[in-house]
Amino acid sequence: MEVILLDEIENFGQLGDKVKVKRGFARNFLLPKGKAVLATKKNMAYFDERRSELESKAAKAIEEAKARARAINELASLTIASKAGSEGRLFGSIGTRDIAKSLSDAGIPVMKNEVRLLNGFLRTLGEHEVHFKIYNGVFAQLKVIIISED
């Protein structure tokens, strides 16, 4: 099934690309989320009319993502308090949701699906390196320090 991408899709293409995808991917993801339209003559003409509008919208989204990534990189570290045992292991763990909430509380809006924990959830006290994928091609990283609540 051929579709025209209305947004940049990782591993598929850029805005405006005409790509061939499997029917299920198009019907269940691309079309309902508004990330693509079927590649008909009518849709091709409609897309050509709206191309500049969509490109400016995409450029604006990239600029916003870069600004958020700069804000995360400029933040020296993020400290999170959690209950821990005497050996430095946490009761529970710190996950993507906890990190996103702490950053949002600090004034930098981050969604939990943008947080990348390379070694899984954080389960020990100390410093941990956390990576963020804000947008396709826009990355950031931050040092998260976990301290004991006691």
UniProtKB/Swiss-Prot annotation:
Keyword Calcium: no
GO CC, alphabetical: ribonucleoprotein complex; ribosome
Gene Ontology molecular-function annotations: rRNA binding; structural constituent of ribosome
Keyword presence, Ribonucleoprotein: yes
Any single biological process term in GO: translation
Entry keyword set: Ribonucleoprotein, Ribosomal protein, RNA-binding, rRNA-binding
Record-linked InterPro entries: Ribosomal_bL9, Ribosomal_bL9/RNase_H1_N, Ribosomal_bL9_bac/chp, Ribosomal_bL9_C, Ribosomal_bL9_C_sf, Ribosomal_bL9_N, Ribosomal_bL9_N_sf
HAMAP family linked: Ribosomal_bL9 (MF_00503)
Protein task: Binds to the 23S rRNA.
Family: Belongs to the bacterial ribosomal protein bL9 family.
Protein's name in the database: Large ribosomal subunit protein bL9
Species assigned in the record: Hamiltonella defensa subsp. Acyrthosiphon pisum (strain 5AT)
